[in-house]
Structure formats: structure tokens, C-alpha cells
């Protein structure tokens, strides 16, 4: 099945059970072959490479020591699990990663019994593993639950909430802290290795339990002094006092690329009679692949690449991305206004704020994986008179919703939200899709919600946000590139809650929010060719809705189509609510809403995802045709008074 002669040992491994039959001395060769296969696969598909290369040895050791899938491995985030997938029966599909009908780039329960818990967002692993561990305890089972979490994910409060609650799970819960930035402490050579093996050994842990019992019988003052001495000694030796204060038995640091260190330590903690236990493993992203080791980002996420040179395939030239348009316009605004500051949650590159930071390092705040804090931090800055732009992916803004309501909207604070990756996101699939921000933002009193139809509109909206101080305001924009309109010239401050009529018709009206405008215009051309005169409006604002324009369109057309790149409850709901409140549908007006379907769409190319959702020209034409085929009453023809925008460049 696998003719690659460079991986003879890996070729024999179809399941972890077969891995566990190997002689321990063979594991180094297996790890080397697994690293080659991971690089080769990502060279074909693109994806997250550096993090997977950093856990090759750890992945081998975990499956060798623990009885997976009976013992549950719960990977945080999941983008480091390509090697795990190769070892768990999915090697034959590994070159379908992140493609239509292919393997997910993250863990997915429906994909394999070895994926104990699905993940793609950070800092969930300890909570989930605690659930598995408590289920094991309640079932009187000895099955282990192992959370593998990176040091970056430890910046999120959820990880500490779980650790604070973990003591009840006892020995069944093991947390592997994968420290790949050496941000906590580096291993300190032979002494560190010896101490890690020693303090994880059964005799040492038994002795410590005995001494704990002795201390508990001491007078209060002596007992307190003894505990402090124990903490001091362990802190000097290992640096783990903080985790011990949370109720964990700390082991480490351990060299995560040395199987001779890893395996004995993991065996010791597996067989421990007390817990929970945290094992601090130090790794290096991109380990074993020179181009990744040399790269600044350690090849965290890559395009398809030449595995020999490490050179990545370059995207064809085209219009700038929406993210870069946002970033460049924000830099221009900040040069004119020193009250503008920016906040991101561990995504400076993804949100374009790395560019902003080059110009204004003291005005860009990366708060780590802490979206709740990011939103309230922005609220505090706004309350103090600054102009914060809180820049988050749509899917991660979900984590800060209570703060949106309680700390921003209720107080009507002028926080600017830049909601990146809105709508469908292609290869990252359902976990990273920005499906819901429209629905949860338009429901908030005081909130202004905008969506640009092209890159110039985005620049106008950023300019408008910089000059809006009446309350919170947001702009949502998609992953990918613009449509190619000119960005030259002065940007305009848009009147709040005012859309623009792009094309005038008489029978069908398409109300478009966001970047579906291009498809709406294509559909209008086809409908006009069929004798169905079609108006097209770029609504710009989901909230406040342009009620005057909406009212005119609803009164003067037989079929109304709304289209948006969001789930049920967003822009269309605003239109339908207004139509219902004003009785505009009472005489037979047909309104059809095109939005994301009520299901989680799997990974695919973006435009294919939108076509599948019916959010393209074909979908619009089909919706109009279906609406007209139903019986309808005549509609009074009212002359439109809104002028067509003269400078429309699409």
C-alpha cells in the first residue's frame, strides 16, 4: 500500500496497537520516518506543519505508552495532529488533508475513534479531558485521559478554570504541557532529566504521600513550615510550584525530542497512584526540518511546498486581501489620530496588526488567547477616551460575547470591532467559519453592523469607524482577496444606516449585504435577459437597516431576495421584521432569504462552499424562479426615488 522505501518501519504500522508491539529501540527510527511522511504530506496539501513536526516524538511516545483509544488523547487546537492521524489508520488519506471530502486539519470525532474529542479552537483540552477522567472514575475504570496543550493555549483563562477543578479526577487525568516556545523554563541538561525521572517514579511519589501524612499530623505551625519547605525545594528543582498550587503533581521539564527521557516519564505517570499530574515537555516547532527551523514562524501554516528546498507555492498575483486593506487603511487613520489603538488575541499576523505594530508598537496590544479580556480591555480604553479597534476572527469573537453585551453594548462604549474571516473560510472548515457574528451582533442595542461589498467599501468603513464615537461599531469582512476595485483617492465617511442602489429595475429586487454583491449583479444580468427587470442594492449596514431604501424596494417589486454571508438571524431577519411590522407582505409580496444553511458546512474551496449554500448567481436565479412559480397577487408599482450610485465600479 505504501511503496515509499524510505519508511519501511512506518509502512508496517496501521494502528497504535501495532506500534506498541515494536521494540523500544526501534522508536527513534519510527519517529524519523513519521517526520518524513508528515513533511511529504503537507508538501502536497499545505496546512499546519511546524507544530506537527514539534510533537513527532511526543506522539510516538504517547501511543506507545498509553492504551489508545481506550485511554483518551485530547489534543488542544488539533493542528499538530497530522502525525497522530498517520499513526491511527489514516495514512492512506493523509494527502487529502483540508480538501473536499478529505481528512480534517484538526481532530474530529466522526473521523476516527482515536480522535477522542474534536478541537480547533484553543484551550479546551483540559476541560474535555477532565470530563473523560471523571467519567472513568464514575465508571470505576482505570482508563486515563491525557490532555496535550501548548504553552500558547495556557494564556486562556479556560485552561486555568479546568485545572482549578481537576483535583477530583485524581490519577486518571494527565496534562502534557507542550512548551514549544521555552516561555516557561528550558530543560537544564542531565540534572533536569534525572530529576524528572526521579520525581515521576513510584517510590518517590509513594514517599511523598507518606511524608504528606506525617506533615498533616504535625502541629499547625510546623506543618505550614514543612509545606513551604517542600514547595521551595520543588520550585528550585523543577519550577513547578505554580501548577502544584492548582492541585497538580508537576513533572518536568522533559526534552520532548528525547524518547529515552519521554517514555520512562510517561510510564511513571501512567502508573501513578495519585494525581492529577502535569508533565512539562519542552519541544521545538519545526524540529528536524531545516527550512522550518530557520523560518521566523517555524512554518506554522504553509502553502504547498517543495520539500527539499522548503519553498512554498506562491499565490497568483491579484487584488489585495481584505485583511491587508483593513490594516493599511487603519495605519493611515492612526497617523492622523493618536487616540487610535489596536487589540488582538494572539493573531497579529492573521488580522494584519503586525503591519500596524511596525508603525505604532506602543499602540498595538496582543493580549494572548484571551478574547473575553480583549473585549473588556477595549471597553476600558474606550471609556478612558481612546479609540480601540478590537481585531478578532469572527469565530473567536464568539468567545467574548458576554463582554460584548455587558461591557460594551449596555454601556454604549465606542469600541470598534474588526471582524475578520467573516463567512465561510474554505479549508479550515466549520470550526473556523464566521457564520454567526451577524446574528449575534444585530441583536445588540446600540451596535452598528457593517459589511463591505468590495475592498474600497472596506476602506471607507474603516475611515468611518475612526470618526464614529456615538457607540460600538463593527465591520465584518471575509477571508481572501478583494474584487480589484481602485483604492486611490480620499475615503468617505459613510452616513450611518444608509445603503446604495446600484441598479434599478421593476420586478425583482436583490438586497445584498457584503461581498455577495458581485454574484448579485451577475444574477441580475441573467434575470434581465429573461425579461425580469432587476434592482440591486448594496445595503452596507445590517444595523441600523436602511429603512427608507428597504421600504421603497419592498413596495415597488414583486420578488425580494436578501443575500448575506451569515447564518439565520442576521440581515434577513432585520428586513423581515421591518416588513412584518409595517405590513409590507400583507398583499402578497414574495420575500426569499438566502443565507448560510442551518448546518455546519465541511471544508472545501470557498466559492464551492458558497455555491453549495446557494449564495451565488445560480442560487439567486433559482430562488427568483421558484418564487415566481408560486401564485402571487398583483403588486402596486411605485416609482423609485432613490438614485442609482453613479460611481459604481463593479
UniProtKB/Swiss-Prot annotation:
Pathway as given in its UniProt record: Metabolic intermediate biosynthesis; 1-deoxy-D-xylulose 5-phosphate biosynthesis; 1-deoxy-D-xylulose 5-phosphate from D-glyceraldehyde 3-phosphate and pyruvate: step 1/1
UniProt-recorded Gene Ontology molecular function terms: 1-deoxy-D-xylulose-5-phosphate synthase activity; magnesium ion binding; thiamine pyrophosphate binding
Keyword Transferase set for record: yes
Keyword Transcription regulation: no
Keyword entries, A-Z: Isoprene biosynthesis, Magnesium, Metal-binding, Thiamine biosynthesis, Thiamine pyrophosphate, Transferase
Pfam short name (any one): Transketolase_C
Cofactor note: Binds 1 Mg(2+) ion per subunit. Binds 1 thiamine pyrophosphate per subunit.
Organism of this sequence: Zymomonas mobilis subsp. mobilis (strain ATCC 31821 / ZM4 / CP4)
Family: Belongs to the transketolase family. DXPS subfamily.
Assembly and binders: Homodimer.
HAMAP family: DXP_synth
Listed cofactors: Mg(2+); thiamine diphosphate
Role: Catalyzes the acyloin condensation reaction between C atoms 2 and 3 of pyruvate and glyceraldehyde 3-phosphate to yield 1-deoxy-D-xylulose-5-phosphate (DXP).
SMART domains to which the protein is assigned, alphabetical: Transket_pyr
GO biological process: 1-deoxy-D-xylulose 5-phosphate biosynthetic process; glyceraldehyde-3-phosphate metabolic process; terpenoid biosynthetic process; thiamine biosynthetic process
Positions of thiamine diphosphate binding: 79, 120-122, 152-153, 180, 289, 371
Lineage: Bacteria, Pseudomonadati, Pseudomonadota, Alphaproteobacteria, Sphingomonadales
Protein name according to UniProt: 1-deoxy-D-xylulose-5-phosphate synthase 2
Catalytic activity entry: D-glyceraldehyde 3-phosphate + pyruvate + H(+) = 1-deoxy-D-xylulose 5-phosphate + CO2
Residue numbers binding Mg(2+): 151, 180
EC class: transferase
InterPro entries: Dxylulose-5-P_synthase (IPR005477), THDP-binding (IPR029061), Transketo_C/PFOR_II (IPR009014), Transketolase-like_Pyr-bd (IPR005475), Transketolase_C (IPR033248), Transketolase_CS (IPR049557)
EC number: 2.2.1.7
